[in-house]
């Protein structure tokens, strides 16, 4: 796997988190396997490669790949605006988080505790999702710049949906961190669009 392909997997995962946030906000729905894939990425330490972070394959990242492709293609008719907005906001938030060693250490400790919950309850149990959501609230929600999620009020006001959205935003931050560690930069989305698309299309077709 090439370095750019590794980056695309992580970048696609950012967009997958954003896509799921948008879907829950607008419909109240999200696939269990997709949710588990993204939440599980928060608990993977020292992976041997990027795919291992997401369960060993990228089957559950397809919607993210498509949302990313729509952003890179710049076609107003197919552009998924909210997933793009959330994804860019996640990348920006991650850069702020990187300057906060104290917060990173806190997140590491809390994720260790959540790992124990997962062993007993499973990744998508409401108590586990609530724990991820609480971690997001206690850390990233304290930054001046917050991510404003738009959708149907009846879905946004549902406590379970709100928890899933926050948990997915936390997962998006994890993927944004991985993307940057793999050499990803925002300018690539502007100046390397064609190169990214040339490698992204085969990933979409493969799935």
UniProtKB/Swiss-Prot annotation:
Cited Pfam families: DUF489
Keyword tags: Cell inner membrane, Cell membrane, Cytoplasm, Membrane
Membrane topology qualifier: Peripheral membrane protein
Record flagged with keyword Electron transport: no
Localization in the cell: Cytoplasm; Cell inner membrane
Domain of life the protein comes from: Bacteria
SUPFAM superfamilies to which the protein is assigned, alphabetical: YcfC-like
InterPro entries, per the entry: HflD (IPR007451), HflD-like_sf (IPR035932)
Broad class of the protein's primary localization: cytoplasm
A Gene Ontology term for the protein's cellular component: plasma membrane
Family of this protein: Belongs to the HflD family.
Name of the protein this chain belongs to: High frequency lysogenization protein HflD homolog
Origin species: Azotobacter vinelandii (strain DJ / ATCC BAA-1303)
